[in-house]
Amino acid sequence: MLWLVTMGRRLNGVFIAFMIVAFMIGVAGALQAPTLSLFLSREVGAQPFWVGLFYTVNAIAGILVSLGLAKRSDQQGDRKKLIMFCCLMAVGNALLFAFNRHYLTLITCGVMLASLASTAMPQLFALAREYADSSAREVVMFSSIMRAQISVAWVVGPPMAFMLALNYGFTAMYAIAAGIFVISLVLVALWLPSVKRIEQPADIAVTEVSGWGKIGRAHV
């Protein structure tokens, strides 16, 4: 109980906004990742080889795009604007999968949109760390709480994904994911701060929870 009171004093509205956005982006990603292979085999009619190829291309593209955007964001630009851009790409990606069943389109446009969208989470953690540093808050505690939101999202998301996909169809599932990303975009625009860039002495590893559940790094 004492820990909760202490934590409540240390967390302000901006930190709560960070946690809400992290949870919502995590849920939206957890809606898409577990059902991807089922979607490709059932809805698109892809054979096992093409399903595997999709995952391979998606992983390679995700790594390259994430590294490129991370490097650019470290050198210049506003992380908040980049997060908003990634959320917008995530909306486009979810809507593409909701209404398109053409494999070639999905493995090109879909993978590119997903790769751009996947950068949202590591950039969110990087922005949260910069804000915590600038406001003299406990960075480690706050990062741990944010990671807990991701864990909860991945407990809730997969069962919800299969429930929606099997009972209401993949179009409804991806449309709901798109809606969650839209809400996240609005929350980022209204609640999250823009932090003046401060040089950091070391790289900080950050878990990336994308639409497909990849792992990445954000350099802070």
Name each model feature, range by range.
Residues W3-A59, R217:
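Helix-loop boundary and gating motifs at the non-cytosolic
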Residues L64-D78, A165:
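Helix-to-loop junctions at the C-terminal end of transmembrane segments
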Residues A172-L190:
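Symmetry-related core transmembrane helices of the 12-TM Major Facilitator Superfamily/SLC fold
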Residues V111-A148:
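Cytoplasmic helix-loop-helix junction between adjacent transmembrane helices
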Residues K81-L96, A175-A178:
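Structural signature of the two symmetry-related core transmembrane helices
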Residues A59-L67, W154-V155:
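Residue-level signature of mid-helix packing/kink "hotspots" within the transmembrane helices
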Residues G13, A98-G110:
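Helix-loop junctions at membrane interfaces in 12-TM secondary transporters
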Residues M1-F15, W191-H219:
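Juxtamembrane intracellular "pre-TM" segments in multi-pass secondary transporters
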